Amino acid sequence: MEIIHTPFGIDDPYFIVQGYEREPREPLEGDRVKVSFVTDPMVVGQRAWIEVQSDGKRYKRRAQYQLNHGGKAHWEVNIDGESAGVTVRYRFIAGRGPSTYVTSEWYEYTVCKWIEAKRFLSLKNNRLTVNRSDATSCDCLKEAYLLTDGKELYDLKIILEREEGERFYGLGEHFDAITIPEGEERYIHVYDQYKVQRSRGYAPVPFILSDRGRAILIDTGFLSSFKIDGSKITLSVYTKGCSIEGTEIQFWKEDSPLKAIEKIHKIARPCPPPLWALGPWLSANQWNSQKKVMEVLRETVQRDLPATTLVIEAWSDEQTFYIFNGAEYDPVSGDDKFSLKDFRFREPWPDPVEMINKLHERGIRLVLWQIPVIKSFDESTPQPAIDIRYGSSRGYFVRTRDGSDYRIPAARWHEGNVVVDFYNEEAAKWWASKREYLVEELGVDGFKTDGGEHLWGRDTLTAAGSAAKVRNTYPERYFETVSGILREEGILFSRAGYTRSPAHTLFWVGDEDSTWEALRDNITAGLNVSISGNPFWGWDIAGFSGEVPTMELYRRSIELAVFTPIFQLHSEDSGDPSPSSERTPWNLAKAWKDESIIDYYRNFASLRMTLSPYIYRESLHAAQASLPLTLPLFLIEKDNDPEGLAYLFGRDMVVSPAVDEEMKEESFFLKVNG
């Protein structure tokens, strides 16, 4: 029999793993602690206890059986509250009787308490730092507290005064509103929430901006949060057992919100896209063969549909993610890398060189999908296992506290697989070198750098420390690594992100359904990232998931996409779905038996091509001026409703999105003085 208990779960701020965790995860003075655990298998007549040691006391307490789920018995038991500084040790005993008892390992926690923090804070040049040795007066703070166990400093909570009527914006990607709602603690946590994200985001930023020109950036990789409530603004940093010393918060105040935005853009340093990335993009997860890609090219050419970028997601062996599916090769040692000549290409990608050349001849650039994990599930393709063994022996993967390779937890995306540690410079060079032939010999123009939200739990370790400290910044290192192998006009296109990600990548908000609600949510998220230092974004036009969109939703989305930074069609379904779910205009025409949608798409895609030089010019200006390319109108017109989603697109266009089905007018665009 096995006893299973995970005190912190996977440190998910939104979700407690019922039946396995400790609540609260980090007990405070006086907290009664509920402990849940599982015995596997469930045996009739089983009993279970907890044995506790704390401050010289020892006691055993019978655990209460809760339920049998999947042949496993779930139990709960409480531990008494203790004083701050007391270390509590506990373990479990279970079985039918003395001859069958099984005992778990010991677990422990030290009880913490909040203390007044101002004496541990240093404020210089509008930067607040947790610093024991160089603290200064911080009378500007209404209240400040630090969590301590009597030895180390952990979480930080700061309360600031809020001016009457002051409204706040920012937080990077969130989908529910432009104005930050009152009374809700909004976590900044890079999170792979599949659809219906609301306040959760793949690319949050710990930054808020007020309509009075006040701005705050929590410049840390730790989990953080903001709460706007009445007369207070509460900032929190959660370190999950790591020292908080050195954590920095930046404050600035300008004459206008627009002026205050400039600084977050200067910190993020967004890199403007090349001209070719500003035309229409085509993508579908079901394009899993050269034959399908060539069919897409033929449809595009024969129907005279403008396109500058094609994304292939399902191109690789789905294990190394750098070898084309079906390619034959002689395996190389883990420290070696392949050249193009090493492969004997077979179906479904018999000649990638010819395919890429044909795309390039038509002015279409190629972007290939990537993920920062390595899998090994097919013995007929030996290279993945070789790479994993070598990477493991060299310490190139994220690991656990016991020194073993970390594996993505069950029920999370890409569960059970190793994750590359990009904080290890040698690991980053090794991983990147495997992909160099794709750019240098095949001429790949960019990568869709998916993923990056894979580091779960404080006991997950990188070369830069615990995942508690670097989960949010991990995508930045991932993108920095991949950008190092690109050519001068190469691009990355990413979903995850954080404060400084825009220096390396373009971005899409998603993933979302093909619904009117999702259309509004996507534009909301795009404007939120614009406010927060990430100006070059797109979304999956008309949604990427579920049945194909209605004709009206598709039309409206195409219209609006012309006036957003990245214009991209994409669909989720893989393989050979029947009917096809790709969002290409010819497939929509087939699905709805209406060829007029092809002409409609062509007209707006052509308009996009006509506008591309303008968008390129304005992208350069946005980067140089440290301003959003899509600038919400309420930031310069006080009477404009933020939730109306109107925005400037560059300096010379105003966009008023028609994102609700009952809004029958076309989205409307006006020329304004520059």
Task: Give the predicted meaning of each segment.
Residues M1-L156:
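Glycan-association/targeting regions that enable binding to alpha-glucans and other polysaccharides
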Residues A94-P274, S283-Q286, Q290-Q302:
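Catalytic and substrate-binding clefts that recognize carbohydrates or anionic sugar/phosphate headgroups
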Residues P273-A464, P502:
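Aromatic-lined carbohydrate-binding/catalytic grooves of carbohydrate-active enzymes
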Residues D304, G484-I485, Y498, F567-G674:
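Carbohydrate-binding surfaces of carbohydrate-active enzymes
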Residues E436-E440, N472-I491, V509-S574, R602-L611, ...:
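Catalytic-core region of carbohydrate-active enzymes that cleave or remodel glycosidic bonds
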